[in-house]
């Protein structure tokens, strides 16, 4: 869980620069021997680099969830060529998933469950992410419109974790890791004060999801930071719900390790859909400040190897658990986390 007595304030350039100068350590050889690992968002960037590293660490099975079959097959062939003849091509399986479409996410989980016996899904790495220069929307299964970035960055990983939960609970030592960012700490009490002080006449409260996704307050940066905050709320909700389930079934030990990781500022194609000016600036900025995608992916990979209560609900960054404190108070966090998590489960039909 997050802590509220650590360093405060928005994440600085100097913090990012230190990460670039001090990349994390790679995972030990053979780390995934006998394990089945599933990764989403792995056709390029950090997700691809994580898949490549895991493929070289002797997994039993590696499932690549990519937007299209063609992108996934291209990634598979590149991984096979890079790792070399020691990697059997049958180990890698490609299954398409469009994370902006919740019905596609459900179909993906159905396909995986059909081909994955109970007790054999060891690691799930949720690395699909999206940044857009403008507010685009998609319609969910109930007809409600949401920003595409919110669906990809928050709803899809939440749904994946919930859909895979029974399969993960049947696998001893299973891990679900979501790729996040400590930039969730950039959301401040001032940013959320309108939500906490407003009420709907009918229900007594205002929808937190509608507030965060209001087109009148949408900016690329705000949407990114707040999506990361909501993803932390999802993480805490998964941990708390599991604890409640364990308490009601004391004789069963079916605990899944849920955690987040932050790869740091990395040189990727995240801003590929932005204008030339933004892309040029980020290229220069990343050249000076950032890690390579390969270095950032090390954090994703080593995070999957963590075990124990010490890691539960934590964020793994720079080879340690993050100690940065949120930009909102502990009381604000408790209120918002509960509201956001319950609303997300309602949207996903998991309430």
UniProtKB/Swiss-Prot annotation:
Classification via Pfam families: adh_short
Residues annotated for NADP(+) binding in this entry: 46, 66, 98, 224, 228, 268
Organism this protein belongs to: Sordaria araneosa (Pleurage araneosa)
Keyword NADP listed: yes
Sequence similarity: Belongs to the short-chain dehydrogenases/reductases (SDR) family.
Keywords: Antibiotic biosynthesis, NADP, Oxidoreductase
Its biological purpose: Short-chain dehydrogenase; part of the gene cluster that mediates the biosynthesis of sordarin and hypoxysordarin, glycoside antibiotics with a unique tetracyclic diterpene aglycone structure. First, the geranylgeranyl diphosphate synthase sdnC constructs GGDP from farnesyl diphosphate and isopentenyl diphosphate. The diterpene cyclase sdnA then catalyzes the cyclization of GGDP to afford cycloaraneosene.
Signal peptide: none
Gene Ontology molecular-function annotations: oxidoreductase activity
Class of the enzyme per the UniProt entry, highest EC level: oxidoreductase
Record bears the keyword Isomerase: no
Active site: 224 (proton donor), 228 (lowers pka of active site tyr)
Upper lineage: Eukaryota, Fungi, Dikarya, Ascomycota, Pezizomycotina
The protein's name: Short-chain dehydrogenase sdnK
Superkingdom: Eukaryota
Enzyme nomenclature, EC number: 1.1.1.-
GO BP terms: antibiotic biosynthetic process
Pathway involvement of the protein, from the record: Antibiotic biosynthesis
């Amino acid at each position: 869980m997050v802590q509220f007595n650590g360093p405060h304030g928005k994440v600085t350039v100097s913090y990012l620069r230190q990460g670039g100068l001090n990349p994390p350590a790679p995972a030990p050889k053979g780390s995934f021997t006998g394990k089945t690992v599933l990764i989403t968002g792995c056709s390029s960037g950090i997700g691809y680099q994580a898949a490549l590293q895991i493929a070289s660490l002797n997994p039993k099975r590696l499932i690549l969830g990519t937007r299209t079959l063609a992108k996934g097959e291209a990634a598979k062939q590149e991984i096979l060529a890079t790792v070399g003849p020691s990697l059997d091509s049958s180990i890698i399986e490609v299954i398409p998933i469009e994370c902006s479409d919740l019905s596609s996410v459900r179909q993906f989980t159905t396909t995986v469950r059909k081909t994955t016996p109970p007790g054999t899904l060891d690691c799930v790495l949720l690395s699909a992410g999206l940044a857009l220069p403008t507010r685009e929307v998609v319609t969910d299964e109930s007809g409600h419109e949401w920003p595409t970035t919110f669906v990809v960055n928050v709803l899809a990983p939440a749904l994946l974790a919930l859909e895979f939960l029974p399969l993960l609970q049947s696998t001893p030592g299973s891990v679900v890791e979501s790729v996040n960012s400590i930039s969730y700490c950039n959301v401040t009490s001032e940013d959320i004060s309108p939500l906490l002080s407003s009420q709907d006449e009918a229900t007594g409260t205002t929808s937190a999801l509608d507030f965060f996704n209001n087109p009148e307050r949408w900016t690329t940066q705000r949407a990114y930071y707040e999506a990361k905050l909501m993803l932390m709320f999802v993480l805490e909700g998964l941990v708390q719900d599991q604890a409640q389930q364990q308490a009601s079934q004391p004789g069963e030990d079916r605990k899944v390790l849920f955690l987040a990781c932050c790869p740091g500022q990395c040189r990727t194609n995240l801003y590929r859909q932005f204008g030339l000016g933004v892309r040029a600036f980020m290229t220069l900025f990343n050249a000076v400040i950032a890690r390579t995608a390969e270095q950032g992916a090390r954090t994703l990979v080593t995070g999957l190897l963590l075990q124990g209560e010490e890691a539960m609900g934590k964020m793994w960054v720079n080879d340690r658990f993050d100690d940065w404190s949120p930009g909102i108070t502990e009381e604000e966090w408790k209120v918002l986390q509960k509201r956001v998590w319950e609303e997300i489960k309602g949207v996903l039909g998991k309430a």
